[in-house]
A protein has these predicted regions:
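Primary detection of the long, small/polar-rich alpha-helical "axial" segments characteristic
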Residues: 1-213
Length: 213
């Protein structure tokens, strides 16, 4: 029995198939820009690259988390700066009211402005938010806001931002603490407002310190 064959043609066909496959892989790598597109290209290399890719994406997200944290702190600081300006105005009014050149009508007008300013401090404390999270109403005073700035769960790169309640009650400048009906009342109000300003300055230092760390 005679079997006819063309060994050279068969080898050429086989080599052409191999070259076609290699060309396809080369085109795939060229078009994707990746040396490894599937486990068959390099199983060990793929495992390593995926691990590194996950780490890089985690670091990128941690960076975005840091920026969000900075934005949160800046929002709180902006509100606290406004509160500080109001406290300074309240102190100015109390000093004015302590002068006995004022008559009852004058002190009544000053008291109305003080009451309005106190209400504004309360409004700032209850409405200052970042991403619908209240910042100055005391919610962050105990639990704080934890910022994940590390790429992994076991990475100890976290920050905790705590912001105490900053309304008129916490600052001790309610209507009973800030009144200017008499010279003595106005003098007491000056002391109470000075204490409130000291509390503000302490909270502001904590915010700045947290941001630097």
């Amino acid at each position: 029995m005679i079997i006819n064959h063309n060994l050279n043609a068969m080898n050429a066909h086989r080599n052409m198939g191999i070259n076609t496959g290699n060309s396809g892989k080369a085109m795939e790598k060229l078009s994707s820009g990746l040396r490894i597109n599937r486990a068959g290209d390099d199983a060990a290399g793929l495992a390593i690259s995926e691990k590194m890719r996950g780490q890089i994406r985690g670091l990128n997200q941690a960076s975005r988390n840091s920026q969000d944290g900075i934005s949160l702190i800046q929002t709180a600081e902006g509100a606290l700066n406004e509160t500080h300006s109001i406290l300074q105005r309240m102190r100015e009014l109390s000093v004015q009211a302590a002068n006995d050149t004022n008559v009852t009508v004058d002190r009544d007008a000053i008291q109305k402005e003080l009451t309005s300013l106190t209400s504004e401090i309360d409004r700032i404390a209850t409405t200052t938010q970042f991403n619908e999270k209240n910042l100055l109403n005391g919610d962050l005073g105990t639990t704080g806001a934890k910022l994940q700035i590390g790429a992994n769960a076991d990475t100890a790169l976290t920050l905790e931002v705590k912001i105490a309640k900053m309304d008129s009650t916490a600052l001790t400048i309610t209507a009973t603490n800030v009144k200017v009906g008499t010279n003595a009342d106005a003098t007491t109000s000056i002391t109470n407002i000075n204490n409130a300003i000291k509390k503000y300055q302490l909270k502001d230092q904590v915010l700045v310190h947290t941001k630097i760390d």
